[in-house]
Amino acid sequence: MKELLRTLISQGLAGCYADGSLSSGEFPSIIIEKPAHADHGDFATNVAMLLAKAEKKAPRMVAETLVSHLADGSGVCEKIEIAGPGFINFHLKDEAWRQTLLEVDQIGFEYGKSGVGGGKKIQVEFVSANPTGPLHIGHGRGAALGDTICRLLSATGWDVTREFYYNDAGQQIANLALSVQARCFGNGPDDPGWPSDGYQGEYIIDVARAYMARETVHADDQHVTAAGDPQDLEAIRRFAVAFLRREQDQDLAAFDVHFDVYSLESDLYADGSVERVVRRLVDSGHTYEQDDALWLRTTSFADDKDRVMRKSGGGYTYFVPDVAYHLRKWERGFTRVVNEQGADHHSTITRVRAGLQALDAGIPAGWPEYVLHQMVTVLRGGEEVKISKRAGSYVTLRDLIDEVGRDATRFFFVMRKPDSQLVFDIDLAKQKSLDNPVYYVQYAHARICSIFENAAEKGFVVPGADGVNLDQLIEPEEMAIVKALAFFPEVVEGSAANFEPHRIANYLQELAGLFHGFYNKNRVITEDSQLTAARLFLLKCVALTLKNALNLLGISAPEKM
C-alpha cells in the first residue's frame, strides 16, 4: 500500500514540474507513515514540508499544489486532505484494504517475508558462553534474541550465518580444570584442597565422575575420551570443556537454537592468529611499551584510554584474541556482522573496534554492529529466584525450559526491547489464562482452528479467494483486523532492520487482541452464507499470519489448547 502511495506522489510531483506549478524539480525521499490518530487518515506524508524551502513557498501551498495533481487511477483513496502545517493525509477505501486478504491467502506461509536483504551475507554471533557451566538465564535471553534476529534476517532476504564463539582459554578455564581436579580427589568447597576461585555447582561433580569413568563426550567437532588420571590437569581441562560444550549444545537444542559455525578461542592461539594480529598492530605503529607491558593506543580510535595488549607477565589480555577473531570474520567475507551480547560487554565494543581500526585492514569504523541485552530477573511467588541446585549460584536456562516450557520461555525473553531489563514471572508464564501473553496469542490460533472444526460440522468449508465476497466485511472489528494484517510485512522488515524482535511479540498480542475482540462481539457461523464465508476467510488469514509471526519467534502455533 505504501509503495502505491509513493508512486502516486512521485507521479503527482512529475505533473507539477511538467506544467510549472512547482519549479524545484526535486524528488525527495518520500516517507509514508501511519498517523498517530485514526481520524488523521490511514497514511500521511510530509513531502510538501520537505519541498517548501526549495520551492520558496509555504508548506501548505506546496501541499495544495501537489494534491491537485494526484491522479488516483487505482481508486484506492476515499479522501486526500491537507492537515496542520502541510501534512498530506490519505484515507483509503475499505475495498482497497480488503485486497490484503487476497494477498495473504495467495502468499500463505510466506506472507510477511521479503527480499530486501538481496541475498547479501550477514553473520550473527550470539550466546558465545564460556564453557565453564550450564547456560544461565542471561544466555537464554541472548539465545532467544539472537535466534529470532537470525529468523527475521532470513525472512527479509539475508544470507545468515549463525556463529557461536567459545572462550575456551584463559583463567576461567584454568579455574574450571582445578575445580574438576579437586572433585576427582574427593575435595569439596570446604576442604583445604579446593581452589580459591573454584566452581561450586553440582555439575562439577558430574564432570569429575565422567572423567574418572573414562567416558567419551561428543560436542560438535570434538570427541574427547577422558584419561581418568586426576593428576593430568591438561587432560581434565580438555575433557571438562568438551563435557560442558555438550551440555550447552543439548540445552540450546531443547530451546530450538542451532548454529552453523562454532569457533574456539584456543584455535586462535594454536594456529598463530593471535600472534599475527599482535605483530600487525606493532608494525602499524599504534603500540608502545610501558611498565614492561605492550599497549595499544586505542585513544587514537575513540577509546577513552589506551589498552594493555600484553601484560607484564607475558599473557595477552582478553581483547587481543577478540580482535583476532573479528579479523577472521572480516577475512571470511562478512562485511556485515552483528554481535548479540549481554550489556556487561558494553566496554569491549570500543576497544575491539579500535583494535580492528588499528590494523588498517579497511574495516569500517562502526564494524561490527552490536545488540546488547539487559539482565533478567526471575520471580516466583513475587520473590526473586537467584540460585539453581545444579549450577550452584544462578538460575539456568534448562530450569526455565523444564518449568514453563520452551514456547513461554522464548516469548518472555523477546517480548521486551533488548536494552530493557526483563522480569521473568514464572507464575505468569505457567498460567493457562489470557493474562499470560504467550497463552493469549497461541489461544487465538487454537480458537480459530476450533471455529473451523465447528464450521465443518455444520457443513461450511473455509473458502478460497474465488468463493468469497469480501464486501461482506464491513464491521469496525473486521476492518481493524484487515488493516493489522496489511501492516505485518512492514513490522517484519522493521524488526529485522533494527534487530528488535519485541516488535513481533507486540504485533502478535495486538493481532490476537483484535481477533478476540471480534469473536467476543460477532458470530462467525451465521444464517447468511456469504457473510459466514467472508468471516471464515478472514479468520484463515488471521491464523496464517499468527502462525507466520510465531514461527519468526521460534514458537509453535497449536491447533488445540
UniProtKB/Swiss-Prot annotation:
Its EC number is 6.1.1.19. A motif ('HIGH' region) lies at residues 129-139. It catalyses: tRNA(Arg) + L-arginine + ATP = L-arginyl-tRNA(Arg) + AMP + diphosphate. The keyword Nucleotide-binding applies. This is Arginine--tRNA ligase. One of its GO terms (cellular component) is cytoplasm. Belongs to the class-I aminoacyl-tRNA synthetase family. SMART domains: Arg_tRNA_synt_N, DALR_1. GO terms for biological process: arginyl-tRNA aminoacylation. PROSITE patterns: AA_TRNA_LIGASE_I. GO terms for molecular function: arginine-tRNA ligase activity; ATP binding. Keywords: Aminoacyl-tRNA synthetase, ATP-binding, Cytoplasm, Ligase, Nucleotide-binding, Protein biosynthesis. Monomer. It is an enzyme of class 6 (ligase). The keyword Nucleus does not apply. The gene is argS. Pfam families: Arg_tRNA_synt_N, DALR_1, tRNA-synt_1d.
